[in-house]
Swiss-Prot record:
It comes from Anaeromyxobacter dehalogenans (strain 2CP-1 / ATCC BAA-258). It comes from the Bacteria. HAMAP family: NikR. Binds 1 nickel ion per subunit. This is Putative nickel-responsive regulator. GO terms for molecular function: DNA binding; DNA-binding transcription factor activity; nickel cation binding. GO terms for biological process: response to nickel cation. Keywords: DNA-binding, Metal-binding, Nickel, Transcription, Transcription regulation. Transcriptional regulator. Ni(2+) binds at H79, H90, H92, C98. Belongs to the transcriptional regulatory CopG/NikR family.
Amino acid sequence: MLERIGISLEDGLLEQFDKLIAEKGYVNRSEAIRDLIRDALVQRAFTESSGREERVAVVTLVYDHDSSSLAQKLAHIQHENHRAVVSALHVHMDPHNCLEVLVLRGRGKDVVAMGESLVATRGVKYGKLVPATAGHDLG
């Protein structure tokens, strides 16, 4: 069942939102707002969970492979937590930069700790931990 709601937005904010949803290919504002709400709920589930529930997340890392021992540090963290690493993809972006994408699974607090450890490793140019969900609790 769908419920209709109303929201109030400043003109400039609405214009930017409409531009964003057009760029992303949404057919209407409702779909875009539903996705934003789902994303917020997934983020909350990760941060507010007791840490015992099994969670899945994706970690994205970009780094210079020529950086002193960085690749070894990242590999060491992964091997220390090998049971949590479901999959790893390594891409050579250019002659110096690598993209690493990891799928992690385990207790929520362990997944977050490992992901944050990887992202915070000195020399990582870009890193992001993205929680994932099967959507059972999202309606």
